[in-house]
Protein backbone atom coordinates (compact mmCIF):
# COMPACT_ATOMS: atom_id res chain seq x y z
CA UNK A 1 0.00 0.00 0.00
CA UNK A 2 1.41 3.38 -1.00
CA UNK A 3 2.09 5.94 1.71
CA UNK A 4 -0.73 8.23 0.57
CA UNK A 5 -3.26 5.41 0.59
CA UNK A 6 -1.96 4.18 3.94
CA UNK A 7 -2.44 7.63 5.46
CA UNK A 8 -5.94 7.95 4.02
CA UNK A 9 -6.93 4.54 5.35
CA UNK A 10 -5.33 4.59 8.80
CA UNK A 11 -4.70 8.26 9.61
CA UNK A 12 -4.54 10.88 10.81
CA UNK A 13 -3.07 9.46 14.06
CA UNK A 14 -1.58 6.09 14.96
CA UNK A 15 -1.15 4.94 18.55
CA UNK A 16 1.84 2.72 19.32
CA UNK A 17 1.85 1.07 22.74
CA UNK A 18 5.42 0.27 23.74
CA UNK A 19 6.78 2.83 21.31
CA UNK A 20 9.88 4.08 23.11
CA UNK A 21 12.49 1.69 21.70
CA UNK A 22 13.04 -1.68 20.05
CA UNK A 23 10.26 -3.00 17.85
CA UNK A 24 7.76 -0.38 19.05
CA UNK A 25 10.07 2.43 17.96
CA UNK A 26 10.60 0.66 14.63
CA UNK A 27 6.83 0.53 14.13
CA UNK A 28 6.59 4.22 15.01
CA UNK A 29 9.25 5.14 12.47
CA UNK A 30 7.71 3.01 9.72
CA UNK A 31 4.36 4.67 10.38
CA UNK A 32 5.94 8.14 10.43
CA UNK A 33 7.51 7.40 7.04
CA UNK A 34 3.98 6.86 5.76
CA UNK A 35 2.94 10.33 6.92
CA UNK A 36 0.80 9.60 9.97
CA UNK A 37 0.97 11.54 13.21
CA UNK A 38 1.79 9.50 16.31
CA UNK A 39 0.76 8.89 19.88
CA UNK A 40 3.49 6.93 21.67
CA UNK A 41 2.82 5.13 24.95
CA UNK A 42 5.61 3.70 27.09
CA UNK A 43 6.90 3.53 30.66
CA UNK A 44 10.45 4.79 30.12
CA UNK A 45 9.98 8.56 29.98
CA UNK A 46 13.50 9.50 28.85
CA UNK A 47 13.58 6.98 26.01
CA UNK A 48 10.02 7.83 25.04
CA UNK A 49 10.70 11.56 24.82
CA UNK A 50 13.92 11.00 22.87
CA UNK A 51 12.16 8.80 20.31
CA UNK A 52 9.27 11.26 20.02
CA UNK A 53 11.63 14.20 19.48
CA UNK A 54 13.63 12.34 16.83
CA UNK A 55 10.55 11.32 14.86
CA UNK A 56 9.03 14.78 15.20
CA UNK A 57 12.15 16.47 13.85
CA UNK A 58 12.89 13.92 11.13
CA UNK A 59 9.43 13.55 9.62
CA UNK A 60 7.81 16.87 10.57
CA UNK A 61 4.75 15.21 12.07
CA UNK A 62 2.90 15.63 15.33
CA UNK A 63 4.18 13.17 17.93
CA UNK A 64 2.55 12.99 21.36
CA UNK A 65 4.46 11.13 24.06
CA UNK A 66 2.43 9.68 26.94
CA UNK A 67 4.28 8.06 29.82
CA UNK A 68 2.07 5.19 30.92
CA UNK A 69 2.19 1.71 32.40
CA UNK A 70 0.04 -0.59 30.29
CA UNK A 71 -0.70 -2.63 33.41
CA UNK A 72 -2.70 0.39 34.63
CA UNK A 73 -5.31 0.34 31.89
CA UNK A 74 -7.70 2.76 33.59
CA UNK A 75 -5.05 5.50 33.52
CA UNK A 76 -4.16 4.66 29.93
CA UNK A 77 -7.82 4.87 28.91
CA UNK A 78 -8.24 8.24 30.58
CA UNK A 79 -5.10 9.75 29.07
CA UNK A 80 -5.86 8.50 25.57
CA UNK A 81 -9.46 9.70 25.85
CA UNK A 82 -8.36 13.13 27.03
CA UNK A 83 -6.46 13.62 23.76
CA UNK A 84 -9.71 13.62 21.77
CA UNK A 85 -7.85 12.63 18.62
CA UNK A 86 -8.93 10.66 15.57
CA UNK A 87 -6.81 7.53 15.97
CA UNK A 88 -7.09 5.30 12.92
CA UNK A 89 -4.35 2.78 13.66
CA UNK A 90 -3.46 0.87 16.83
CA UNK A 91 -0.18 -1.01 17.15
CA UNK A 92 0.06 -2.88 20.45
CA UNK A 93 3.67 -3.88 21.04
CA UNK A 94 3.94 -3.58 24.83
CA UNK A 95 4.66 -6.89 26.55
CA UNK A 96 5.77 -8.43 29.81
CA UNK A 97 7.44 -11.84 29.88
CA UNK A 98 7.93 -13.68 33.18
CA UNK A 99 10.70 -16.20 32.59
CA UNK A 100 11.43 -19.39 34.48
CA UNK A 101 9.72 -22.50 35.75
CA UNK A 102 6.03 -21.82 36.37
CA UNK A 103 6.32 -22.91 40.00
CA UNK A 104 8.98 -20.24 40.55
CA UNK A 105 7.09 -17.34 38.96
CA UNK A 106 5.28 -15.19 41.50
CA UNK A 107 1.57 -14.39 41.36
CA UNK A 108 2.45 -10.72 40.94
CA UNK A 109 4.49 -11.46 37.82
CA UNK A 110 1.73 -13.62 36.37
CA UNK A 111 -0.81 -10.89 37.06
CA UNK A 112 1.49 -8.36 35.37
CA UNK A 113 1.71 -10.56 32.28
CA UNK A 114 -2.07 -10.90 32.13
CA UNK A 115 -2.56 -7.16 32.60
CA UNK A 116 -0.03 -6.01 29.99
CA UNK A 117 -0.34 -8.79 27.42
CA UNK A 118 -4.06 -9.62 27.59
CA UNK A 119 -6.21 -7.09 29.42
CA UNK A 120 -4.65 -3.93 28.00
CA UNK A 121 -4.63 -4.94 24.30
CA UNK A 122 -8.13 -6.36 24.60
CA UNK A 123 -9.62 -3.24 26.17
CA UNK A 124 -7.57 -0.77 24.13
CA UNK A 125 -8.74 -2.54 20.99
CA UNK A 126 -12.32 -2.21 22.25
CA UNK A 127 -11.80 1.49 23.02
CA UNK A 128 -10.23 2.48 19.71
CA UNK A 129 -12.19 0.18 17.39
CA UNK A 130 -15.51 1.87 18.23
CA UNK A 131 -14.68 5.20 16.51
CA UNK A 132 -12.97 3.30 13.70
CA UNK A 133 -16.24 1.48 13.05
CA UNK A 134 -18.10 4.80 13.02
CA UNK A 135 -15.65 6.19 10.44
CA UNK A 136 -15.71 2.98 8.41
CA UNK A 137 -11.92 2.62 8.30
CA UNK A 138 -8.97 1.80 10.51
CA UNK A 139 -6.34 -0.76 11.40
CA UNK A 140 -5.28 -2.81 14.42
CA UNK A 141 -1.93 -4.60 14.81
CA UNK A 142 -1.48 -6.96 17.76
CA UNK A 143 1.93 -8.45 18.50
CA UNK A 144 1.83 -12.19 18.97
CA UNK A 145 4.81 -14.54 18.82
CA UNK A 146 5.86 -17.87 17.39
CA UNK A 147 6.06 -18.90 21.03
CA UNK A 148 2.28 -18.72 21.05
CA UNK A 149 1.93 -21.43 18.41
CA UNK A 150 2.35 -24.20 20.99
CA UNK A 151 3.14 -24.65 24.66
CA UNK A 152 6.49 -23.12 25.55
CA UNK A 153 8.13 -24.36 28.78
CA UNK A 154 9.87 -21.72 30.92
CA UNK A 155 7.80 -19.00 29.26
CA UNK A 156 4.47 -20.81 29.58
CA UNK A 157 2.39 -17.82 30.72
CA UNK A 158 3.93 -15.45 28.18
CA UNK A 159 3.37 -17.91 25.34
CA UNK A 160 -0.25 -18.36 26.39
CA UNK A 161 -0.85 -14.60 26.28
CA UNK A 162 0.65 -14.44 22.80
CA UNK A 163 -1.70 -17.22 21.67
CA UNK A 164 -4.56 -15.10 23.01
CA UNK A 165 -3.42 -12.12 20.92
CA UNK A 166 -3.31 -14.21 17.74
CA UNK A 167 -6.74 -15.76 18.27
CA UNK A 168 -8.24 -12.37 19.13
CA UNK A 169 -6.81 -10.88 15.95
CA UNK A 170 -8.12 -13.73 13.82
CA UNK A 171 -11.64 -13.34 15.16
CA UNK A 172 -11.64 -9.57 14.82
CA UNK A 173 -10.15 -9.78 11.33
CA UNK A 174 -13.27 -11.61 10.14
CA UNK A 175 -15.70 -9.62 12.28
CA UNK A 176 -14.43 -6.12 11.49
CA UNK A 177 -13.36 -6.53 7.86
CA UNK A 178 -16.89 -5.75 6.57
CA UNK A 179 -16.81 -2.57 8.69
CA UNK A 180 -13.66 -1.32 6.96
CA UNK A 181 -11.26 -2.26 9.77
CA UNK A 182 -8.10 -4.26 9.01
CA UNK A 183 -6.82 -6.45 11.86
CA UNK A 184 -3.63 -8.49 11.92
CA UNK A 185 -1.47 -10.34 14.43
CA UNK A 186 2.28 -10.43 13.91
CA UNK A 187 3.68 -13.81 14.94
CA UNK A 188 7.33 -12.87 15.13
CA UNK A 189 10.31 -14.98 15.99
CA UNK A 190 13.49 -13.59 17.53
CA UNK A 191 14.03 -9.88 16.90
CA UNK A 192 17.24 -7.89 17.31
CA UNK A 193 16.06 -5.48 19.99
CA UNK A 194 18.08 -4.12 22.93
CA UNK A 195 16.40 -6.60 25.27
CA UNK A 196 17.15 -9.58 23.02
CA UNK A 197 20.77 -8.56 22.55
CA UNK A 198 21.28 -8.23 26.30
CA UNK A 199 19.75 -11.67 26.91
CA UNK A 200 21.70 -13.48 24.19
CA UNK A 201 25.36 -14.16 24.96
CA UNK A 202 26.01 -16.00 21.69
CA UNK A 203 25.23 -15.15 18.09
CA UNK A 204 21.55 -14.62 17.17
CA UNK A 205 19.39 -17.66 16.48
CA UNK A 206 18.57 -18.59 12.87
CA UNK A 207 15.76 -16.46 11.51
CA UNK A 208 16.46 -13.52 13.83
CA UNK A 209 15.30 -10.30 12.16
CA UNK A 210 15.97 -6.60 12.49
CA UNK A 211 13.13 -4.73 14.19
CA UNK A 212 12.67 -2.46 11.18
CA UNK A 213 12.14 -5.47 8.90
CA UNK A 214 9.48 -6.92 11.21
CA UNK A 215 7.67 -3.58 11.32
CA UNK A 216 7.79 -3.11 7.54
CA UNK A 217 6.61 -6.63 6.74
CA UNK A 218 3.78 -6.33 9.24
CA UNK A 219 2.50 -2.97 8.01
CA UNK A 220 2.78 -4.12 4.39
CA UNK A 221 0.66 -7.17 5.26
CA UNK A 222 -2.06 -5.16 7.01
CA UNK A 223 -5.28 -5.71 5.09
CA UNK A 224 -4.15 -8.96 3.46
CA UNK A 225 -5.01 -11.50 6.15
CA UNK A 226 -5.25 -12.14 9.89
CA UNK A 227 -1.69 -13.37 10.53
CA UNK A 228 1.74 -12.32 9.31
CA UNK A 229 4.93 -14.27 10.05
CA UNK A 230 7.93 -12.12 9.14
CA UNK A 231 10.92 -13.92 7.64
CA UNK A 232 11.17 -17.00 5.44
CA UNK A 233 12.89 -19.11 8.12
CA UNK A 234 10.13 -18.34 10.60
CA UNK A 235 7.40 -19.17 8.07
CA UNK A 236 8.99 -22.54 7.38
CA UNK A 237 9.50 -23.21 11.07
CA UNK A 238 5.89 -22.50 11.98
CA UNK A 239 4.64 -24.61 9.07
CA UNK A 240 6.71 -27.53 10.33
CA UNK A 241 5.59 -27.08 13.94
CA UNK A 242 1.90 -26.71 13.10
CA UNK A 243 1.43 -28.98 10.07
CA UNK A 244 4.16 -31.61 9.99
CA UNK A 245 4.75 -32.43 13.65
CA UNK A 246 2.53 -33.64 16.44
CA UNK A 247 1.75 -31.20 19.25
CA UNK A 248 3.94 -33.29 21.55
CA UNK A 249 6.88 -33.02 19.15
CA UNK A 250 6.36 -29.28 18.65
CA UNK A 251 6.37 -28.70 22.41
CA UNK A 252 9.51 -30.82 22.77
CA UNK A 253 11.31 -28.69 20.18
CA UNK A 254 10.21 -25.49 21.88
CA UNK A 255 11.36 -26.91 25.21
CA UNK A 256 14.87 -27.32 23.83
CA UNK A 257 14.84 -23.71 22.61
CA UNK A 258 13.73 -22.34 25.98
CA UNK A 259 15.67 -24.70 28.24
CA UNK A 260 18.31 -22.09 29.07
CA UNK A 261 15.84 -19.42 30.13
CA UNK A 262 15.70 -18.73 33.83
Q: Model-found features: residue ranges?
A:
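Conserved glycine-rich Rossmann-like NAD(P)H-binding loop of the short-chain dehydrogenase/reductase
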Residues: 34-51
Amino acid sequence: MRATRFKETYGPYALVAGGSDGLGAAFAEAIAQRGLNLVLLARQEDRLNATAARLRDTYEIDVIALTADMADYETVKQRVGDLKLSIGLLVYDAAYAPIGRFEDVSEDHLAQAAAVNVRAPLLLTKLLSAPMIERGRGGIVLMSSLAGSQGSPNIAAYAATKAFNAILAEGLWKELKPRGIDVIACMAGAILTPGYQQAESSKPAPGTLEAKDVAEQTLNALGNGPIVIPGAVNKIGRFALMRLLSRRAAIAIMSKNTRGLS
